[in-house]
Amino acid sequence: MKMKRARIVDLLSTPDFNRKVCVKGWVRTRRGNKNISFIELNDGSTVHGIQIVVNVVKLGEDSLKSITTGACIAINGLLVKSKGEGQKVEIQADEIEIYGIADPSVYPLQKKWHSLEFLREIAYLRPRTNTFGCILRIRHHLAYAIHKYFNKQGFFYFHTPIITSSDAEGAGSMFQITDLDIANCPKTKDGEVDYTRDFFGCSTNLTVSGQLEGELGALALGGIYTFGPIFRAEKSNTPRHLAEFWMIEPEIAFYDINDNMDLAEDFLKYIISYAMKYCKDDIEFLNNTYNNELIEHLNFVLSNRFVRLAYSEGIRILEQSNEEFEFPIYWGIDLQSEHERYLVEKYFKCPVIMTNYPKDIKSFYMKQNDDGRTVRGMDVLFPRIGEIIGGSERESDHQKLLKRIKELNMSMDNLWWYLDTRRFGTAPHSGFGLGFERLVLFVTGMQNIRDVIPFPRTPKNAEF
């Protein structure tokens, strides 16, 4: 079979009938009788399969015995208009080659409904299902759209380190890395681990954010974005948390908080619009199968202007509502998802960008307002999931930043370089972070973040 392989998505979208084609993929189903057999073949390029019509008498019954659900095969045949119902295109097979069999007595993905919980246990095979094929194609197009958007905006893709000695969030939930012998660690005179003997000569961790290094890029290149993996050692075993995930973090010189909000809105609308254009079939499948409000939620974002809302005003609205919240409302709380969703879904009925948060619930690097109580932070709030973006105008004043670091009793040993950028040619700048899996979760309509990444890393689970 030396004919060039055709993708099923191309054969279905722009068919050129009555020509020889070669398709290769995995068998979804096979049915028929002693004279004719029908194979549904999928190659991963689309949620839709293509029907293969096999003349059993012509090709021989033995050639079909190993063609069961999950088998990988190649077909040479004639592309024709389908005579049956349910499909417009089919291939009349001339040749069949079997690459790999799938013993039906042990193959886990038989033709029946499989729960998402079961599929997480066989994450190495779940990309072959319609559901995860859709999710992974959407994930690809979202990633491509992110690069395309920032390139059009004149931003530079900036690579930040995965191994770091600093904690960008100041939260301490980091994975430590070392090549020291755990059973026989070298110690200092004080009995502490002697990290000068470690590989890097100091204590190092997997990064929780590329923001701090990204700011350095913005203060030289003007506008940058990062897009890479980050790691959080939070032992949160929930549908919203992963220990390893991907983050998009733009940082832009000469942007204030208003510029930052405008960028976030434009960015999100572009990405979601791109997905709806290029992932139409996949989104429709997920809408019809898992979440019949998915397309409605996506259009909700695209068709509405994002409301700008000060935190204090948001608290007032929540306090005066008649809602019975699980978590009480008062000025100074870190809003929960139920509060955010009320503002978006019930009160404003549009996405919300909340700003001017209490400084005590936000990170040290956010620019302080003149009131001394709040900072120029911002969160973009969406229906169903709540916060999707967190960002701020960054503190550009060296003395204010230094004072805030001291107030929080943070070590300056690993932040001296960050402070130096405020000493040498500082500039106003802003940025935000978007968890890629949170975005994929919203665009696919799934409920559990473990279902939107190929191989989820969670507490007590690092298989595959």
From Swiss-Prot:
BP terms from Gene Ontology: asparaginyl-tRNA aminoacylation
Signal peptide span: none
Subcellular location, principal: cytoplasm
Keyword terms of this UniProt record: Aminoacyl-tRNA synthetase, ATP-binding, Cytoplasm, Ligase, Nucleotide-binding, Protein biosynthesis
A Gene Ontology cellular-component term: cytoplasm
Domain of life per record: Bacteria
Reaction equation(s) it catalyzes: tRNA(Asn) + L-asparagine + ATP = L-asparaginyl-tRNA(Asn) + AMP + diphosphate + H(+)
Subcellular localization, as worded in the UniProt entry: Cytoplasm
Coiled coil (residue ranges): none
GO MF assignments: asparagine-tRNA ligase activity; ATP binding; nucleic acid binding
Enzyme Commission code(s) on record: 6.1.1.22
PANTHER family from the UniProt entry: ASPARAGINE--TRNA LIGASE, MITOCHONDRIAL-RELATED (PTHR22594:SF34), ASPARTYL/LYSYL-TRNA SYNTHETASE (PTHR22594)
Subunit structure: Homodimer.
Record-stated family: Belongs to the class-II aminoacyl-tRNA synthetase family.
UniProt cross-references to HAMAP family, sorted A to Z: Asn_tRNA_synth (MF_00534)
Official protein name in the record: Asparagine--tRNA ligase
Provenance organism: Azobacteroides pseudotrichonymphae genomovar. CFP2
